[in-house]
Design a protein with these regions (language model features):
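Metal-dependent amide/peptide-bond hydrolase catalytic core
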Residues: 2-247
Length: 248
């Protein structure tokens, strides 16, 4: 599946009394412009009319000549703002700093350096260039022993061919145990429940991320994900797994 990284954008401003905001330089207003650019980066197309080429561009061999085929399978990268922070002397003062966290999902052909430079090149970031810092988060949380092993918050994209030996081994084991038919849901409405009519095992990709981005993506140890349910339920409110997906 796709890789991921965690990006931080910091913006500096100058505080002043809220009764005369023109004396200061509001960091939140600067960040507002950057937020719109990041939204455009995620949502825009890659046509000539787009000043900011959207992340969908990596599905196009023109922008991703080596890895476009794998990117088309995995799906385009995405970015979303997940956190926002600010500092201000009080509720009656201009904010002198603002920061955001960006959750960046990466398709084939994208690297951490590529993603950082992509943010740095945004028009609003260039506009406020001297007051903006774009960086990658680091994991530095102590382990249960107290040891701190600082690691970049970057985990590479990884992909296996369906013909890979370890993929076929799992598929063969699944067929030997349960056959190729979906358990239950034979009367499912294909308009709303097409996945339940597909034979199993279904060999595909995931949109979300798992520890395999570290095991295979970072360390090159062959991996395969296996599980029940629908990925649309992951981290969803009232997350469920259908009884038909469980062996009882």
């Amino acid at each position: 599946h796709r890789g991921r990284m965690e990006i931080r954008v910091d913006v500096k401003g100058i505080s002043c009394h809220g009764s005369a905001p023109e004396r200061g330089d509001n960091a939140i207003y600067k960040m507002a412009d950057i937020l719109q650019n990041i939204r455009s980066l995620n949502e825009n197309g890659d046509g000539p009319s787009n000043e900011i080429k959207g992340l969908v561009k990596m599905l196009n061999p023109e922008f991703n000549p080596v890895h476009a085929e794998d990117a088309q399978f995995l799906g385009r990268g995405t970015c979303t703002v997940s956190q926002i922070f600010y500092t201000s002397p009080s509720r009656c003062a201009v904010a002198d700093s603002c920061a955001i966290s960006v959750d960046r999902r990466m398709t084939a052909g994208e690297t951490w350096d590529f993603c950082l430079k992509e943010i740095e090149a945004l028009p609003a970031v260039q506009k406020y260039k001297d007051d903006v810092k774009v960086s990658m988060y680091m994991y530095d949380r102590p382990s249960w022993t107290g040891e701190v092993y600082e690691t970049e918050c970057f985990f590479p994209t990884w992909i296996n061919k369906e013909s890979a030996a370890h993929v076929q081994a799992l598929a063969d084991a699944h067929k030997a145990l349960w056959g190729e038919a979906r358990i239950g849901h034979a009367d499912a409405d294909p308009k709303y429940d097409a996945m339940h009519l597909r034979n199993r095992p279904l060999i595909d990709k995931w949109t979300f991320s798992t520890n395999c981005v570290s095991i295979q993506g970072r360390y090159g140890i062959p991996c395969v994900g296996f599980g029940t349910g629908a990925e649309s339920q992951a981290h969803a409110p009232n997350e469920i797994t259908w009884k038909q997906d469980l062996l009882t």
